[in-house]
Swiss-Prot record:
PROSITE patterns: RIBOSOMAL_L19. GO terms for biological process: translation. The keyword Ribonucleoprotein applies. It comes from Phocaeicola vulgatus (strain ATCC 8482 / DSM 1447 / JCM 5826 / CCUG 4940 / NBRC 14291 / NCTC 11154) (Bacteroides vulgatus). This is Large ribosomal subunit protein bL19. The gene is rplS. Gene3D superfamilies: 2.30.30.790.
């Protein structure tokens, strides 16, 4: 049991990300290594689900690339994640938004929650 905790602490990045939930539109700056070059790719989409807990937490982001829906799963403690930015706070009543996969066009939009700042 202690070996698992030691391994988790060794791989923990310790980065602080903003809090977000399912339905929020976020931008993930993800570092990609291509050969000897490294670049940052921005991936913007709607958070469909958040799964796991602690260091093993991961979230799924769905975006539309043309007419095709693309989903990507990001571990929250991934060292390749440069930053996470919350663009919109969505107004949803579910924790898992799998129903968005079947919707297209304006039906797939999520209402924006008004946030006082």
């Amino acid at each position: 049991m202690d070996l698992i905790k030691i391994a988790e602490e060794a791989f923990a990045t310790g980065k602080q990300h903003p809090s977000f939930k399912a339905g929020d539109t976020i931008t993930v700056a993800y570092r990609i290594v291509e050969g000897s070059k490294e670049r940052v790719q921005l991936y913007r989409g709607v958070v469909i689900k958040i799964a796991g807990h602690g260091d093993k937490k991961r979230f799924t982001v769905r975006k539309m690339s043309g007419t095709v829906g693309v989903e990507r799963i990001f571990p929250i403690e991934s060292p390749a994640i440069d930053s996470i930015t919350v663009n919109k706070v969505g107004k949803v009543r579910r924790a898992k938004l799998y129903y968005l996969r079947a919707l297209t066009g304006k039906k797939a939009r999520i209402q924006e929650k008004r946030v006082n700042q």
